[in-house]
Every structure is written in C-alpha cells, then in structure tokens.
Swiss-Prot record:
It is an enzyme of class 3 (hydrolase). It comes from Pediococcus pentosaceus. One of its GO terms (molecular function) is alpha-1,4-glucosidase activity. This is Alpha-glucosidase. The active site is at residues 201, 256. Its EC number is 3.2.1.20. GO terms for biological process: oligosaccharide catabolic process.
Length: 557
C-alpha cells in the first residue's frame, strides 16, 4: 500500500452531527449555517475531512436515517443553497466533506414507498420487500433493531413489508436492478455537486438471504435474529456500485459493517476488491456488552486485555491489504471518555488525552466525533423524559414495560451507560445559555457540565484536551511511520497498553495506562536511552511508575 498512498489514508475525519452542532435560526436545532460558522474552528484543530450525518429531507423518526427525499435538504437544517455555501466554504479552506448515505432503507414517507403500497402490481412494489403472512403471523420471526417484529402489516394491500429498523424505515430490495440504478444515479448527482465521498450506513445489510428464512431465537424472546448481514450478493452489489459510480471519482468511502471480522473486512475493503476504501468495525465496542442476553444494555467495563487483542487483530489482519478506520465513539455510542476512560473530574482530561494517544498513532484513518476533542462526557440523564432516541425508548418499553426483565431503576442505569443520546447532546461551545448552541430550547437537553467543559475554555487553556488533539493530528501528518509502519503489540497480558509502530527507521512506541491507579511499567524495548518523547499527557516521567491514565509516545532511534 505504500506505493499508492491515497489522500484519505493520511487524513483525519471530524464527524458532525448537524442537529446538535450549532443552531443559527433560533429553533433549538442545529443547521448547515451553524456548521459553516465553525469551519475555522475545525481548520484550526487540523482535521482534513468533515463527515455529515444525514441532512436529507426526513420525517425524523430516526433522526434523519429515515429519508423521504435524497436530493432535498431537511428544512430543519436549511436549504440546498446553504449546503452549497457550506461545501464551497469547506473546500476554500482545504477541507473535504463526505455525506452519510442511507440506502438499506428509506422513510415510509418516501414517494416511492407511498406508491409501492398502493397496490400489488405497481412498478415500485418490488423496490421493497412485500410478503404475505402465515395466517395472522408475520412472514418470518425476525426482530427489528428497535424491537418487535421486523414486519409491519399494511391494510391496503393486506401484505407485510420488511423493516429491519423502525416501522417507518422500510427496507429496500437490492435484488431489483432498477432500484440499484436509481441509487447510483442519486449518488452520482451528489458527487457531481462536489462532495468528497460517502459513509454508508449498515451497508453490509443490503443483501438478504434468499427466501428470508427464520433466524435463531434470541434469549428471552419470541423473535429471532434478522438474517440480513453479509448476505450472498452484497459484494456483487458493492462491486457494481464501485464500477458504476465510485471508481469515477477521487473520493473516500467507508462502510458501516456490523458483525464483520478482519477476514470479512478484506472482502469489503481489500485493495484488490474494488468495493469500499475502509469499513467501520465494532468488535471493540461489543466487549462491554451484557453477558445475559441484553446486548448493548450493559454497565460492564471493557476488559483491557480483550481490547488490546481486538485492536491488534485488526491492525495486523489488515496491514498491507486493507485500511483501518479508527474511532472510539460516534453518534450511536456513549462518549469515549465515559466509556473507555474516566469522566470523573480528577481523571477526565488525562484519560481523554490517553485515549486519543492510543487511537491516533495506530494505522488507519482516525475519526473524531464532535466534542470528543473537548473531552465531552455522557449526559447521565436521570429521567426517561430526557431521552429522545428511538432505540433507547424502544428498549425501555421492551425490557421494562412489556417483558419486565429489568426494573425501571436498573434500565435507567443502563440507558445512562449506553444510550445513543449520550453522544447527541448539543455541542458545548461556551458558558452562555444552552452552552452557546442555541438561544432557544434545544431539541435535546444540554449536558449540565457545559460550564466546565466547553470550546471557549479549551481554546483558552494550552493544556486542554483540544490542544492535545491538535498536537496528535500534527504528529500524524508529520510522521510517515504512523501511516505506513507495521504494528506490534507489546506485553499482551499486562495491565497497560504498549505498542510499537514503524518500519525499522524512527519507529514510534506508545505506552498507555488505562487505569486510575499507579502501576509499574513493563520496560523492554521502550527503555531506549536515545528515545525522544513526542507527546505525553504528563509533564515529566516518573521512573518505574505509570500514573493514572498516563500516556507517552517515543520516537526510537
């Protein structure tokens, strides 16, 4: 891969969740003009690419992941003219913009779905999955991602349609070539406007198993797993997409691919596969999942030894053959410092810096989620009424109200630890009302710690998390060994995280403490008297001791 380095392999991506970034029209909802207003902030941070969560027209059943028109901007966010202004302003600053592409499903308010449900013979019927049930039973036992059956009965034509997410998100039938061609036409339209690529939502679910067979029953449930990931034609579809659209432009693509292994990733993003540039994998985010059949609704902490193994497996498994995406959090997860670090005031800054150090010196393209560079924390909501996320509210209804597997107090603790709303609270800009996000009531409650954690305070403090991120980004751009070097995990079973990265010349060594207690560091190859410290979250090293959440990066001669 060293001979053909692509621009996106040396880039750092910043994810913007538009609804929560900046409101400029006083309605409590972030908008495109708000993003444009902060481009200089992002440029100063040093990032190269902005990934926008969906901004298309949508009823917002799932915060924009239910699209009713792919070629119009949601009124909440502004107009197409606002988008064109944002795109031009970003390009003028040397920043690229990639769009969120959601083509596993649409909104049930999309004109084609409305026409699809009118009768059984119209030209759009086969754009979606329509099936007759078994008497009063759904066509199969699949459970939707947000709970309940993945099938919704429609009175008008007396058949069911498939929705692997909410009832307002019917799945598209990629077996239909006319449907696929319409998707490619839409993608080309955006690329011709000048966007620089796509992040593809649940893209490994676009090929379903033939016959849509029942899935194995889930624990404590009448429903089975939906058989929708890594289907038999998914690579055929993506290769066709690449040939028809992606290969015609100098862009970057990243696919959200739940349930993949490094071996699977080579099929999606291998240098010789002609599909995607990289994938989002989630193995490291599942290590703290419940061991009692409750999935993500857990309060467990991630075991460090297991985390090191997963990261190592991906670094080694893809080296020279595919490209990693690197991230701790996004719009679907809790905040990184609360989940993998320690958000208590005594440790928040140190642990946020340590986590950043760990991630940004691995091989791959790093993704920073908005507010991560400030060390923003989980919201720690204590009332169900504070939540807006459909997944969280559906889980409470399922696990507490309907199946009564958890008490209200237990479920609230799990929501506080794992809800998607933890990462969706408004961006914390300053100490003004609503953290400077909006002068109106915000769509989601602002984290009350904004008076201590905000961008204005960070920019005024040379020792802030923000400036540490800026330094790390500069190091990535400065040292080719980060992009090109080989990865070696050191002391896999130790209670610290150490690895080397390089090609034998000016190798980099990282030493990381994932605990709030002191430990004795394992030395070995890092104890090089000629080593030069490139970055650390402590002022000076203490011999034979790693302090809470300490991080050091050395350049070895």
């Amino acid at each position: 891969m060293a001979a053909t380095i692509k621009w996106w392999q040396q880039a750092v991506v910043y994810q913007v969740y538009p609804r929560s970034f900046q409101d400029t029209n006083h309605d409590g909802i972030g908008d495109l003009k708000g993003i444009t207003a902060h481009l200089d902030y992002l440029k100063q941070l040093g990032i190269d690419v902005i990934w926008l969560n969906p901004i298309y027209r949508s009823p917002n059943d799932d915060n924009g992941y239910d699209i009713s028109d792919y070629q119009q901007i949601a009124a909440d966010f502004g107009t197409m003219a606002d988008f064109d202004e944002l795109l031009q302003a970003a390009h003028d600053r040397g920043l690229k913009i990639i769009m969120d592409l959601v083509v596993n499903h649409t909104s049930d308010e999309h004109p084609r779905f409305k026409r699809s449900r009118q009768d059984r013979t119209n030209q759009y019927r086969d754009f979606y999955f329509w099936r007759s049930g078994n008497g009063k039973k759904a066509p199969n036992n699949w459970e939707a991602a947000f709970g309940g059956s993945a099938w919704q009965y429609d009175e008008q034509t007396q058949q069911y349609y498939l929705h692997t997410f909410s009832t307002k998100q019917p799945d598209l039938n990629w077996e239909n070539p006319t449907l696929r061609e319409s998707v490619y036409t839409m993608m080309t339209w955006w690329l011709n406007k000048g966007v620089d690529g796509f992040r593809m939502d649940v893209i490994n679910q676009i090929s379903k198993l033939p016959g849509l067979p029942d899935g194995p029953l889930k624990p404590h449930s009448q429903f089975g797993d939906a058989r929708v990931t890594n289907g038999p034609r998914v690579h055929e579809f993506l290769q066709e997409m690449n040939q028809e659209v992606l290969s015609q432009f100098d862009i970057m693509t990243v696919g959200e691919t739940h349930g993949v292994t490094p071996a699977d990733a080579l099929k999606y993003a291998g240098a010789d596969q002609h599909e995607l540039d990289m994938v989002f994998e989630f193995q490291h985010l599942r290590l703290d999942n419940s061991q009692h059949g409750l999935g993500k609704w857990s309060t467990r902490k991630t075991p460090l030894v297991a985390l090191k193994k997963v990261i190592s497996d991906w670094q080694v498994g893809l080296e020279g053959r595919a490209w990693n995406s690197l991230f701790w959090n996004n719009h679907d997860t809790p905040r990184a410092v609360s989940r993998f670090g320690d958000d208590r005031p005594a440790y928040r800054v140190r642990s946020a810096k340590m986590l950043a150090t760990c991630l940004h010196l691995l091989q791959g393209t790093p993704y920073i989620y908005q507010g991560e560079e400030l060390g923003m924390t989980d919201a720690h909501f204590t009332e169900l009424a504070s939540y807006r996320d459909i997944e969280s509210l559906s889980a409470y209804r399922d696990l507490v109200t309907e199946r009564q597997l958890l008490s209200p107090a237990d479920m609230m603790a799990r929501l506080a630890a794992a809800s998607r709303d933890n990462s969706r609270t408004p961006m914390q800009w300053d100490t003004e009302v609503n953290a400077g996000f909006s002068d109106a009531a915000p769509w989601l409650t602002v984290n009350p710690n904004y008076r201590q954690i905000n961008a204005a305070a960070a920019l005024a403090d040379p020792d802030s998390v923000w400036y540490y991120y800026q330094h790390l980004i500069q190091l990535r751009h400065q040292y080719p060994s980060v992009t090109l070097g080989s990865f070696e995990l050191l002391w896999a079973d130790d209670p610290q995280y150490s690895y080397m990265h390089g090609n034998g010349k000016a190798d980099l060594a990282s030493l990381l403490q994932f605990h709030s207690r002191d430990t004795v560091p394992t030395t070995g190859s890092i104890s090089d008297p000629t080593a030069k410290c490139l970055i650390s979250n402590y002022g000076e090293q203490q011999p034979n001791k790693l302090r809470p959440y300490e991080a050091w990066v050395y350049q070895l001669a």
